[in-house]
Amino acid sequence: MHGESPIKRRESRKIWVGSVPVGGDAPIAVQSMTNSDTNDVAATVAQINRLEAAGVDIVRVSVPDMDAAEAFGRIKQLVKVPLVADIHFDYRIALRVAELGVDCLRINPGNIGREDRVRAVVDAARDRGIPIRIGVNAGSLEKDLQKKYGEPTPEALVESALRHVEHLERLNFQDFKVSVKASDVFMAVAAYRLLAKQIVQPLHLGITEAGGLRSGTVKSAVGLGMLLAEGIGDTIRISLAADPVEEVKVGYDILKSLRLRSRGINFIACPSCSRQNFDVVKTMNELEGRLEDLLVPLDVAVIGCVVNGPGEAKEAHIGLTGGTPNLIYIDGKPAQKLTNDNLVDELERLIREKAAEKAEADASVIVRG
């Protein structure tokens, strides 16, 4: 039952990706990217639906050629969540997906080609109200910047980004967001800090090619956590060599830990020791699996003994403290005693009841407001 986040977010211009606001006073949007073959429409739609069920706000889809562009158009008709088309090199692909209803174009103006081609893409985006993401990556910096700096640096990333920002602004286009990604945490953080001071556009945060599920989660949590804690960032994507649904889960967990956005259960659990009166690890694994469908923000404490249990339980909506017998707290007050028999079943029941009660109360406040 913790309060609002103490973080003061950087002021930025608000843009819209489909129905999702990004920047300004909008909640930080959670993104992911499909890793299916875009030409396999059924598989890509199924993956997007899974991402949407996990709570994703925006999904990016790679569109490498014209066949994929046509597939993208069919995919767009079959899903509800806003879609970003990831496009490189061939400006005609951007023009085609704009015709097919894309919600955002992810391009690098530096590899689209001549000025007239960039202008054609910008005109198509402007005519249809489509925003653009300028995506700068340490692994694909322009050759002149590689020569100037010798290697990727925060300054090189920012110079590349500003070059493209100025390009769009010369074309009188302001409806864009920017990312400056690197796989090195320090480089990415430094680049975003520099860029945040120089532009007002919303920033898309990410540590690119972060790694597998565990290592990538840690890298992303460290890098994005540093930036988000400073108020930098308007939308995030956790890049993992894993099921894209895991990217969404990790993204929400990072935002929940900083109290920037709440969705589903925020578990507070001890690592367990010989004082535990029930199997904390097993209990947590079962609860997390059973309660993934709950979207209502709730703090649930699962503590194995009485050393820290009562204190943590009193701060949660639902708290379990190990003892003889175990004790359940609801809204900070002792509510009932539990034995280890059917412990998880009973705790799940109480959590679901509390979630329903909170959802009804929240809806009532919205209606009265």
Swiss-Prot record:
GO MF annotation terms: 4 iron, 4 sulfur cluster binding; 4-hydroxy-3-methylbut-2-en-1-yl diphosphate synthase activity (ferredoxin); 4-hydroxy-3-methylbut-2-enyl-diphosphate synthase activity (flavodoxin); iron ion binding
Pathway the protein takes part in: Isoprenoid biosynthesis; isopentenyl diphosphate biosynthesis via DXP pathway; isopentenyl diphosphate from 1-deoxy-D-xylulose 5-phosphate: step 5/6
UniProt cofactor(s): [4Fe-4S] cluster
GO annotation terms (biological process): isopentenyl diphosphate biosynthetic process, methylerythritol 4-phosphate pathway; terpenoid biosynthetic process
Disulfide bridges in this chain: none
Gene3D superfamilies reported in the protein's UniProt record: Dihydropteroate synthase-like, Sulfite Reductase Hemoprotein, domain 1
Catalytic reaction annotation: (2E)-4-hydroxy-3-methylbut-2-enyl diphosphate + oxidized [flavodoxin] + H2O + 2 H(+) = 2-C-methyl-D-erythritol 2,4-cyclic diphosphate + reduced [flavodoxin]
Keyword annotations from UniProtKB, A to Z: 4Fe-4S, Iron, Iron-sulfur, Isoprene biosynthesis, Metal-binding, Oxidoreductase
Keyword Manganese in record: no
EC number of this enzyme: 1.17.7.3
Entry note: cofactor: Binds 1 [4Fe-4S] cluster.
Annotated binding of [4Fe-4S] cluster, by residue: 270, 273, 305, 312
Pfam families (UniProt xref): GcpE
Record function comment: Converts 2C-methyl-D-erythritol 2,4-cyclodiphosphate (ME-2,4cPP) into 1-hydroxy-2-methyl-2-(E)-butenyl 4-diphosphate.
Classification via HAMAP family: IspG
Similarity comment text for this entry: Belongs to the IspG family.
Name the record gives this protein: 4-hydroxy-3-methylbut-2-en-1-yl diphosphate synthase (flavodoxin)
Gene, per the UniProt record: ispG
